[in-house]
């Protein structure tokens, strides 16, 4: 099995296409930014949480990989995007040659990061949930779809006032 790194994940055109597709779909639905800025933030923050808690560097890197890929299911549909994303991630990571035990960590976290249905199923999963939900920034609000009744838009717009 090949050791898959975050750099390999970031360089993969299929993963990039799914991130872009997810972001475009969510833009059309009026959701906040879910593109490279968001996945970069979630990737870094997931890794930082795990590092601060004393996890080994491979677990930290798996957290970073998970953060980068966590929203690819939105390229298909917003509803159940965690489960769809886990299925997509399985195929992509398996094709890249990642160890199946590591794939299980990544897809378990992706499949459980949605607030409606997910629960933290391990350290990477818990760190991902915290990192994802902590991403609040004015730049996430799309200028053409700001909704003062949407809690996500209100929180994001309150940053840096």
Locate each region found by the language model:
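Non-catalytic interface/linker regions that flank or bridge core catalytic/transmembrane domains
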Residues: 1-17
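Serine/threonine-rich low-complexity intrinsically disordered regions
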Residues: 2-5, 43, 160
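Short hinge/gating elements
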Residues: 23-31
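N-terminal glycine-rich anion-binding loops that anchor highly charged ligand groups
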Residues: 13-21, 58-61
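Electropositive phosphate-/nucleotide-binding environments in soluble metabolic enzymes
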Residues: 16, 36, 40
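Divalent metal-dependent catalytic cores for phosphoryl transfer on phosphate-bearing substrates
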Residues: 27-28, 38, 51-161
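N-terminal low-complexity or amphipathic/hydrophobic leaders
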Residues: 41, 45-49
